[in-house]
A protein has these predicted regions:
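Conserved active-site and cofactor/substrate-binding residues in soluble primary-metabolism enzymes
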Residues: 47-55, 88-92, 96, 115-119, ...
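N-terminal ligand-binding/catalytic initiation module
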Residues: 1-136
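Glycine-rich, charged/polar anion/phosphate-binding loops
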Residues: 1, 9-15, 25-27, 158, ...
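Glycine-rich phosphate/diphosphate-binding loop of Rossmann-like nucleotide-binding domains
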Residues: 139-225
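ADP-ribose/adenylate-binding Rossmann-like module
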Residues: 108, 112, 227-237, 241-257
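Short, glycine-/Ser/Thr-/acidic-enriched flexible segments
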Residues: 21, 32-34, 48, 177-178, ...
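Short, surface-exposed connector motifs at secondary-structure boundaries
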Residues: 102-106, 166, 187-192, 223, ...
Length: 257
């Protein structure tokens, strides 16, 4: 583990366990030279602790670059909570996580991410002020999607010669909060949507509301399109999958695509 931290140039890695609520959490602080480490909290059923550690290290590093590129006086961090098979009280679990954050004395600020909601952030906020994207602040997903949408327009201009998205085929992998908001914005701009998600209900919603064409998750990367937009958990591009791509560009919301 220490070798992994050194390779990632991580400042610190913190662990918390709360048997009463089932909390098993990790907070990684990659770099705090510019200020407190900012990064969302993921709540996912990781296969094991090693998978969770690898994810939090990778994501924390990415947040350092994001914060720096955005000109923020903040560093990069990330948190993951290993989602248990059964939770008696989700609110109590996130309150326990809030107490964990508070022990870091402001060195880490959390926010929504995969598997978490603004209601979860409200529970965290009962025990620490170092949290954002609460219900009072609103869902940040549409704003994130707008940034990706703007990036897609710029990408289309650079690669295809026009930022007019009318008729452009965009394949979206992942229809979570950000992915679906992006799909709505692309649909409004006249793009043709090809979508996939492990949640078939989300896919059906996109078909009914946005006229999207469903594609099996395992087939999406090899589906002909103009732009591929990975909006899931990231890490989808590797030596194997890159050779399958049939798109002109990749521009999505996923971390570490």
């Amino acid at each position: 583990m220490f070798a992994m931290m050194e390779t990632a140039r991580l400042e610190s890695l913190h662990f918390a366990v709360d048997p009463l609520t089932g909390l098993q959490a990790m907070i990684a602080i990659h770099n705090s030279r510019l200020g407190p480490a900012l990064g969302g909290c993921r709540y996912l059923p990781y296969a094991d602790s090693q998978s969770a550690i690898e994810d939090v290290l990778r994501l924390a590093k990415g947040m350092s670059y994001k914060a720096a590129l955005a000109g923020l006086q903040q560093g990069g961090g990330k948190a993951v909570i290993i989602r248990p098979a059964h939770v008696d009280n989700r609110g109590a679990l996130f309150e326990a996580f809030g107490r964990f954050i508070e022990t870091l004395n402001g060195h880490y600020i959390t926010a929504m991410d995969s598997g978490t909601s603004s209601v979860d952030m409200d529970c965290i906020a009962q025990h620490t002020q170092h949290v954002t994207s609460t219900t009072a602040e609103g869902d940040p997903s549409p704003h994130t999607a707008l940034g990706v949408f703007t990036g897609i327009r710029a990408t289309a201009l650079a690669r295809l010669g026009s930022d007019n998205l009318e008729g452009l085929r965009v394949a979206i992998q992942g229809l979570g909060n950000v992915g679906y908001a992006l799909a709505e914005q692309l649909h409004a701009a006249g793009a043709e949507l090809l979508v996939s998600d492990l949640d078939h209900g989300r896919v059906q919603l996109a078909v009914e509301q946005l006229g999207a064409r469903p594609v099996a998750s395992e087939a999406l990367l090899a589906t002909p399109c103009d732009i591929l937009a990975p909006c899931g958990l990231g890490g989808v591009l590797n030596h194997t999958t890159v050779g399958q791509l049939r798109c002109s560009a990749v521009a999505g919301a996923a971390n570490n695509q």
